Regions:
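Non-transmembrane, aqueous-exposed alpha-helical and coiled segments at domain scale
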Residues: 1-117
Length: 117
């Protein structure tokens, strides 16, 4: 797969998947953490819809990293973290901790935060 996407909620995942489909990109949408290897398009995108928008950061990090590992095992060459752009889901927030954990696992030195879709 060209792109692996992790979304913090179902709505964001479906918005992203719909946008990609409208652009002609083959997309496979997964609800929750996948248990089996992906069978999506090798030239397309896998979107994993999690329900971590309003959970504690530790739980969000654990699930996001599991999704990342699944996407990478399926051959994702690029990763996109689709988070809620309103930043108001939890008192302390989990967007930053999840992004930092993903960066750590990917050994990325930089990332872009784009709070709009």
């Amino acid at each position: 797969m060209i792109l692996g996407c992790i979304a913090d909620d179902f709505t964001g995942a479906t918005d992203l998947a719909a946008l990609l489909v409208r652009a002609g990109v083959p997309v496979s949408l997964r609800i929750g953490l996948p248990e089996r290897p992906g069978i999506g398009p090798s030239d397309g995108v896998e979107v994993v819809a999690l329900k971590i928008r309003s959970v504690p950061a530790e739980q969000a990090v654990t699930q996001a990293l599991a999704a990342l590992d699944w996407l990478r095992a399926g051959g994702a060459r690029h990763i996109y973290w689709k988070y809620c752009s309103t930043f108001d889901s939890t008192a302390r927030g989990n967007i930053g901790p999840v992004a930092e954990a993903l960066m750590g696992r990917l050994r990325a030195r930089q990332t872009l935060y784009v709070p709009a879709f």
